[in-house]
């Protein structure tokens, strides 16, 4: 085959690959949107409802590619908890203040150890459990009494 024909064939084959990758990218984007709407948002709504029973001021914001819940008590930030996704791997991010009022930021994992998980395998219950673990840890640090 002549070189220019091979070049033309190669060009059109690479276009097919690009379109296939674009479709896959769109699928993943759609799956991430579903993750936020079907797992993160219901978890945060449930948390908001329960935390407000204990006098907490709770704000939630969930979109196609982010989810955040902020908990304040008597004007003080107790925890800003976010669920983010890197590729298809979700992870929690927390922002809070220590007893001195210093802002602290931390990124974590939903499961302990080196277990692999993604948006398809992470459950609403795991999001709730992780939030509770982070929230209780922050409250203990924030409100514990110093000294004997």
Segments from the language model and where they lie:
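Contiguous, amphipathic alpha-helical segments that mediate oligomerization or scaffolding
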Residues: 14-55
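Long, charged, glycine-rich C-terminal linkers/tails
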Residues: 51-70
